């Protein structure tokens, strides 16, 4: 299999790099010492810290897509792909509160069995509900850019909720893509392995 970069995939890579570098520049503009940093300042700092000071590398493996049966006609769900073959790579870190930050890129087969790349930033507030500190629950969001075949691979911004169940280096992470009847309303999950 030969990987070739089309003009659309180049646009995706450039959009992702622009997204990261924009926040890198924002983080360089420090807030005055006597004021709390703004939302944009904190976001820029988190992106910059994750980009420059990551603690682990991550392998992403998509494992399931589920189209909400209450919001789709059966003939649609019978045609859709719910096995999102693909893979991804990212870097991540835990902050001083133990919360997770990541920069990632992933490509997978979408509902129409077409390749869909996505890249962006992920954040999860982490809880350790048991004495075993290796078991963690996470709740947060992902913000980034994706490209879809049915949108002619135009870069589309995404902001989605994210939740996880983690044990040691393995995480089961998921998001829900909201939508309307016969559109959106998709549960998407993947495994993340830290190495």
From Swiss-Prot:
Localization per record: Cell outer membrane
S-S bonds: none
EC number: 2.3.1.251
Major localisation: membrane
Biological process according to GO: lipid A biosynthetic process
Binding partners and assembly: Homodimer.
Name the record gives this protein: Lipid A acyltransferase PagP
Organism of provenance: Dickeya chrysanthemi (strain Ech1591)
């Amino acid at each position: 299999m030969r990987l070739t970069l089309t003009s659309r995939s180049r646009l995706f890579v450039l959009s992702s790099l622009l997204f990261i570098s924009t926040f890198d520049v924002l983080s360089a503009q420090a807030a005055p010492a006597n004021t709390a940093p703004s939302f944009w300042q904190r976001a820029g700092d988190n992106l910059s810290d994750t980009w420059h000071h990551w603690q682990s590398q991550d392998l992403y493996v998509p494992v399931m897509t589920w189209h909400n049966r209450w919001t789709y006609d059966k003939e649609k769900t019978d045609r859709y792909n719910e096995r999102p073959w693909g893979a991804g790579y990212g870097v991540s870190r835990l902050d001083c509160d133990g919360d997770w930050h990541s920069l990632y890129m992933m490509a997978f087969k979408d509902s129409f069995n077409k390749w869909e790349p996505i890249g962006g930033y992920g954040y999860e507030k982490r809880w350790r509900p048991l004495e075993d500190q290796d078991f963690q629950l996470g709740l947060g969001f992902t913000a980034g850019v994706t490209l879809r075949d049915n949108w002619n691979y135009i870069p589309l911004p995404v902001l989605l909720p994210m939740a996880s169940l983690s044990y040691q280096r393995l995480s089961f992470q998921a998001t829900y893509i909201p939508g309307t009847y016969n559109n959106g309303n998709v549960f998407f999950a993947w495994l993340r392995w830290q190495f």
